[in-house]
């Protein structure tokens, strides 16, 4: 399935149905009074999060959505039926913005969550509403109210517990494939990963979701390489696993480049808990490994994890550390929620 994480669409709620001009027509009743019913309300436009979606690709092929007009009123004081709604089905994690692409309308974070983006127009009054003491047979009815039209942006920010960051070819996709059932594209050239991938990891009876995003390079915040647009997909994570390839000539610089891009992106990414790991260590001899571990430790201020997807060295340790941070974050979040109640 192709991946699309943003789409610009046009929506319009339905017009209200027109009120009816009608009079009672009954045997032995020469001058029946007005009995024109009201028009029905126009259909609404809703957005709803559904299970099983992780892309906005459907909105590449259809960008215009219009709800139905309400039914017109009828005689015998019958109100017209409501127009059919339009429901925009989106993945969990979708944000809806105004046309300026800055004003947030809503953030859809749970399956089944709905939000009304445009309310249908009210139906017009039938002639029964216009009866007065001096006008017992009005021939007037209102048209329905027009629907609301607006242009909006849909932006998807995947919801994951942990995010993988690093330079291209740092081994992020290989790590994801080794610890989850995800099958990202893996090859020995930069930018093999062109869109985010998700996988569910399990360790010690616990499970959590990991997001792998395309690699960053120096200047990504200014649009170099694939830019930093995919960093939005790790904004919601609780912890970052920062992979630095053992094949880098200067592991300290590789670490600092990514930290610089996280800080330039802002949105709190640089403040997230971070676990640092030296990946692809199976490519080093013991002496080179020791030197690179020392250099990376000096750069990040802590002992890095040592990982190899080939020999599986350190994979479970990494998962346990991620799970521990995620558990602490969830517990703190639950405590905050209880305190607010």
From Swiss-Prot:
What Gene Ontology terms describe where this protein resides (cellular component)? cytoplasm
What is the name of this protein?
GTPase Obg
Q: What Enzyme Commission number(s) appear in the record?
A: 3.6.5.-
Protein family (similarity comment): Belongs to the TRAFAC class OBG-HflX-like GTPase superfamily. OBG GTPase family.
Q: Which NCBIfam families match?
A: Obg_CgtA (TIGR02729), PRK12297.1 (NF008955), PRK12299.1 (NF008956)
The GO terms this record gives for MF are: GTP binding; GTPase activity; magnesium ion binding
**Compartments, as annotated in UniProt:** Cytoplasm
Superkingdom of the source?
A: Bacteria
Spell out the InterPro entries in the cross-references. G_OBG, GTP-bd, GTP-bd_Obg/CgtA, GTP1-OBG_CS, GTP1_OBG_dom, GTP1_OBG_dom_sf, OBG_GTPase, P-loop_NTPase
Q: Where is the signal peptide?
A: none
* Keywords, in A-Z order: Cytoplasm, GTP-binding, Hydrolase, Magnesium, Metal-binding, Nucleotide-binding
For the ligand (Mg(2+)), the binding residues are 173, 193
From the UniProt record, report the name of the gene that encodes this protein. Answer: obg
What PROSITE patterns has UniProt attached to this entry?
Answer: G_OBG, GTP1_OBG, OBG
